[in-house]
């Protein structure tokens, strides 16, 4: 393990080839034939019976016996295979579907493939084309199969071929039989063979007419024996067309039918001995093996001696089912087996081979992809702010068990000798010693430790206890993202818990209410180096999801900082020095600034304390500049005042690391903010300085709060009397308004909102009123509370809770919401029996007017519990949903990485993106909103660190020239070439076809230049406003020596210079910072962006609410959001819950025009525009009369005449009404003559049978039921369209339903700007690029609606993965099997055994390139540090590189000399 140079390298598996074992292979690898059903030989003292299922030649399962083949014991012998010979062949359940497919493709008489020669040649040509991937190959094979199924007669022997299928569905005995329905052929006249066959039965049927119904069901039974003989006759050339590679011996179709069955080694099916009795419990496989042997021997005996055909078939069926259960016990219901005792009841299924592989606890997921590891510990965690953020306190008793193998060198020999002497029970000590030339470890618990220490040699390895400074990995499950496992330095402490700094809780999502965490100790120097550099806490302060800080101040730290930096915090010198020593352990040097207050005595402010925390002394390089709003920012009263004059000191300004205004709260110190102090230090001065500041802050706040105290009690939430009074007044007013609305509703006078009925309008209005009253009461409550109220302080500084929580405790709890509505009516039209029926009052529908302080009344308590229950269920369901979703995303994206040519590829080298995210930048390094540099902040920083009063300010044109001087050469490098390698002409530069991989870089330089030009323009505008020359252009040559500002008064010059002086130093520094950050933001090759992208989309899912509806601008036009929506998108669902087409109107200002278009789109039924539909019987005629409501048609702006309605009725295909039967009567009536179906009016003649009255009556009723649902206008798939008024006052049409193409083609709609939220519809109408864009847009929309910030690059990657094969593939087992060809990856995901059987049948090869395969085979994957090889230089000069002499060169030279 610790060797630097080894003589033998371990063998590495390059690839796997799958195939089925042929009968010869099964026998060849077998050590013994299992031929008896007896397991133990009773005469030989219950020894395992020879040739039985437990024969010791196949290995042993108990430690006392030894293997009869290799004479090894249980530890050293892996077991050996046996085999058993079946008396008759049986189908293999794994290849059953494939067997049917082969039979469908060949003639059931001569085994020739059912294709013509030309088809054969064409298909073979397609299959043999180089570079055909798995998806294409399976597509071609499906085409071949479909073509064969259509061929009715064999082209080789002329035999008739019908339909081949399974005899029955389900898990009965018939499910494993194949039948061939020779004569069944749809839509063709029957073959002459059928007539002959039917003719043969005529005489039989004449005597036995009851047999007639059975004759129809007569089919050809393709039993395994018959099928085997057919398969043997298949030509090798035809095998390729069936998807089998016949060049390999095991690639013949007959391989897929069992003739010999392998018996697995005994050690994988051990016998469990019973206590105090000689009996043993046998494994399911052993029991099944004995059953198979017994049944096979019965059949063999029957064949030898003669047996009735019925008995014979029953035995054969039983053998078939038993073998199927042995392989896959799910395929057969054990209760259906012939002779099973409990006729059709429930039987415990056995664990067949498939059951051992599949599922979470199966071999693949349980033992290969993930396993339990050594060198790990687990215990409860607790907080310790005195630790540095990159340390973890490890209990000494854990440190004594976890060891690290350290190699003895001349530098550490003395230390390791001391550790050996201490031994395993004293920390620091050692547990084991591995001598250089010995194989076995020596346990230091025993033996003479002094002697061992004395004889310690260089090169020995000592397994010593964990000690301070060792690198360990720390992890908390569930590991939702990369930062759930980080690397810390160990710190050995007493007591029994792991301790960590609270700043690091967020990435682990840990709290201290009993959480446990895991600790792992890497065992090699290389592993330690990788761990601390790649996974170290300091190097992971930001989340790769969006580049925001994730390790930052939390809870108490924020409260402490807020209290220290408050405006009224002043400290004398003693307190100040005490605070400074608190934050530094008393060993750091501080430069104390001058006090803020001199008289009556020296006082320093809390802001000065914090300034020292950021920059303790003049040796510290940290100079940060920052402007940011606090969490609660009240703007200054006058608009003319700057932000820092905020009424509540709510705007932070830091200049040169001095805090000038604002308090330290969550927005400045917490996580998730890109304008926080720690983020600014990190971006400008690196992670070490940010970590130092965070450590100082943790110590200071924890110790400060320990001294000051901070507690919350019942006093803090006791409302004052006037607050109670105000609350009651506000609630009463709201109740009164609600009562007025309810009265209007009951009278039917309530004005409805667009797209809503009266009840929905009432709910919306009452809901609005009640949420408003809660907000008002909340505001009153917050204003009434004292400034030093503990809950209020926590809510204000953002450490815990919100003002809503405070107002719920003090004033009013508010409306309880269940599934987005008020509490529903439970029984008898009311929510609870305490209220009248159909009551809509606030108190009966879940409004809680009490506060938590005053306590809830019983009905309120129940309503509150209902909504609490909903939240609980939601969380539980969501956990499972998002967990599965994350797993699917991870499996689909795991092997994507950035290569050295900047492309994003899968492990099989399929290109997914040409540059990651279009610009090749790392989301982790994004400073702005998905931009690599925040120009404003960088400019302020550059300006402040280069500011010097003596520097001369540049004129506007000089500013632009300086920028050109630096950016010009960079842009000149990025020239554009066309496809033939020629330079692109200047006028063609902006054409879409010349886009290349450097466009993003060009755009960055361009935006940088624009920013500098903006500064120059601002200066020019200021100069113009003061009567000076703008000078955006350089002056003419003849004027260059003259000062342009000569005539300007000095005071104007000075004022301009002081207001806006930009020196050359500032411009150069700014460009230097911006370009450095851009280069640093480039994505490193080898980054596992697929895995990070999957986690970045999966992890926010756990924080989203599950059942979320959102009103898209209009009430009752619900859009699904949250986890279900993300699930729909990534599953590429064909049917989604709320398909909405957003139609942009040509005339979007006019309400009437919008209504006209709505009428064209929304389906209008006859029932919507008809007064009545009545049946009329008179004068021997019967007809249906429909009266149309022309007024409604006019009001709805429907372009509809009565003739159109008549045409629509005749066109309704289901009604089958002739045009001649529909008559228009007058202006608004339509009459439809009614005749029985199939009866023609014109065929009435005297001889024709009169229609019976019943027929007419039934036809009349049928039409009366169906007529109201006839679509007379609009698109039939579209149930509803709503006119939505956007924020900018324009109107758009929101259309519910499918039919994007039809809506786009509707008059009055701008088709090119019409979109839908249904990805597959976009794909079918607009193509794959549009579908990709649609996926990205929809996921972005969903995430932003939940306030989740996810970098767009992750979402783009997901969109590309779903579409890069040219069709939209969902992230599901079906999509994944089309995206990836790797057998092991698919098998480790879902449907394990199906993929393995498929791989064996189609003889797939797995190149072992992807992540899953490498983990299963224990290899390094080609991602991250595995994506390159380190090659060492040999230092051999070229002169020394001469070819070696050949072995017989001297002899041949001598022979040549002799010949001469």
Swiss-Prot record:
- Where in the cell is the protein located? Nucleus
Give Gene Ontology CC terms.
mitochondrion; nucleoplasm; nucleus; RNA polymerase III complex
Mainly resides where? Answer: nucleus
Residues bound to Zn(2+) 2 are: 107, 110, 154
Q: Which terms does the UniProt entry file under GO BP?
A: termination of RNA polymerase III transcription; transcription by RNA polymerase III; transcription initiation at RNA polymerase III promoter; tRNA transcription by RNA polymerase III
- Offer an example of a GO molecular function term for this protein: DNA binding
Q: So what does this thing catalyse?
A: RNA(n) + a ribonucleoside 5'-triphosphate = RNA(n+1) + diphosphate
For this protein, the record's InterPro entries field holds: RNA_pol_asu, RNA_pol_N, RNA_pol_Rpb1_1, RNA_pol_Rpb1_3, RNA_pol_Rpb1_3_sf, RNA_pol_Rpb1_4, RNA_pol_Rpb1_5, RNA_pol_Rpb1_clamp_domain
Keywords attached to this entry: DNA-directed RNA polymerase, Magnesium, Metal-binding, Nucleotidyltransferase, Nucleus, Transcription, Transferase, Zinc
Catalytic activity, EC: 2.7.7.6
Q: What class of enzyme is it?
A: transferase
The UniProt-reported impact of residue 506 to I is:
Temperature-sensitive
- Please verify whether the record's keywords include Endoplasmic reticulum: no
Query: Where is the stretch described as Bridging helix?
Result: 858-870
Kindly state the subunit structure of this protein: Component of the RNA polymerase III (Pol III) complex consisting of 17 subunits.
Q: What does this protein do?
A: DNA-dependent RNA polymerase catalyzes the transcription of DNA into RNA using the four ribonucleoside triphosphates as substrates. Largest and catalytic core component of RNA polymerase III which synthesizes small RNAs, such as 5S rRNA and tRNAs. Forms the polymerase active center together with the second largest subunit. A single-stranded DNA template strand of the promoter is positioned within the central active site cleft of Pol III.
Indicate the family of this protein: Belongs to the RNA polymerase beta' chain family.
Q: Extra notes?
A: Present with 6020 molecules/cell in log phase SD medium.
**What is the name of the protein in this document?**
DNA-directed RNA polymerase III subunit RPC1
- The gene that this protein is the product of is RPO31
